[in-house]
Amino acid sequence: MVDWSTLPKDLLDLISKSLESSFDLIQFRSVCSSWRSAAEPKSPLPTHHLPILPDNGGSLFPDSAVGFRLSQRSILLIKPHEPCIESDSFGWLIKVEEDLNVPRKVTLLDPLCDTRNSIPENFPRVLDMSKFKVRELGREFKLHYFNTVGDIVESLYLEKAVVKYLDCDGDYKFVLLTIHVSGKLAVFRSWDRAWTVINDMPSPYDDVMLFDGRFFAVDNNGRTVVVDYSSLKLTLVASPVFGGDKKFLIESCGEMLLVDMYLSLEAVEGDPGFVEEIFEHPAFYMNERTVKFKVYRFVEREESWVDVYDLEDKMLFLGDDSTFSASASDILPLCDGSSVFFNGNVFNGEDLGAMQDRDLGVFDFRSGKIELVQKLPEYAKLFWPPPPWITSHARAEDHIGETSSQS
């Protein structure tokens, strides 16, 4: 049997430097003392403060003390090393945001949104990540308003942001791409310390993504462009895909996919004066409901999106600030794949109890049916609350260690 602890230090150093995820590096360093000594812990990313986005040529908040703080989150798939029973072989999805002030302390969030759930009493104060199989499925970046207005406007900026860090000898130079309130693309380059809003906009943009080292953006019609962060020029790489109401870009198995969400407007039932009220306040009395999805695969040489008719083992996840994918055989062995998970108006107001309720839905790509995840126990256990093998003291010991993340 090979003694892995005797691998050359230069080879271990090369392997450790190729691990982008801090969670992968934690598990690498926990193998043995020689691996631990060969790899330094990742330095936390510095706190980036960005000026406020311009609004039609001027700042929304003229006070220079107001701006954005950029934070990074990781979406993790956590599984037990050796499930006690077959039903425990499923994974648990969670989003973590590292505390910038307290090392190894993290905030636990819903993987598809920013919901922060109450921690159960039996949840360990310190979670030793070396006790589990941990895989990073995706990352996301969030722009938070800070200072003068604080939490009051925290939720005003809802658009997705993607970031590319440049290899500049530890200077942490980066480029950020997001969608301006006008629907145009906005770019921030750290060395310029300024925003640029790109005026090209045949249709408002729906999503942005970093794929294969390049920035991609798709508009509401499916027109897809690559954004050159040096010249700030856009290059058309795929013609429009008409039909749906909201487009999502997602990477899966090394390919870029386009997920097209179809919505339907439904009237909310009311008293006899309901019809008159609808005409007076149409937005208030209409409810958007997700009815179906279509999926396309990007073929760059043809500059087009090609229909995907079967997702096979794939499970696609559409979050508010990121998208990611996984295989059913890995994340949920007892279930089929070919599904799309999403945040949105799953059913009408009567089904959910309130017109504006939002919940987690799943679309079966083969049958075309949409269900609430909470009605499907086999899918619901992927999400909050944490599974028994997380909260069990037999697997999650309450002690402090370098491989631990404090929740």
Curated annotation (Swiss-Prot):
Record localization: Nucleus
Keywords: Nucleus, Ubl conjugation pathway
Occurrences of domain F-box (ranges): 2-50
Keyword tRNA processing recorded: no
Stored Pfam families: Beta-prop_KIB1-4
Function per UniProt: Component of SCF(ASK-cullin-F-box) E3 ubiquitin ligase complexes, which may mediate the ubiquitination and subsequent proteasomal degradation of target proteins.
Domain-level remarks: The F-box is necessary for the interaction with ASK proteins.
Subunit structure: Part of a SCF (ASK-cullin-F-box) protein ligase complex. Interacts with SKP1A/ASK1.
This protein's name: F-box protein SKIP23
Species, as recorded: Arabidopsis thaliana
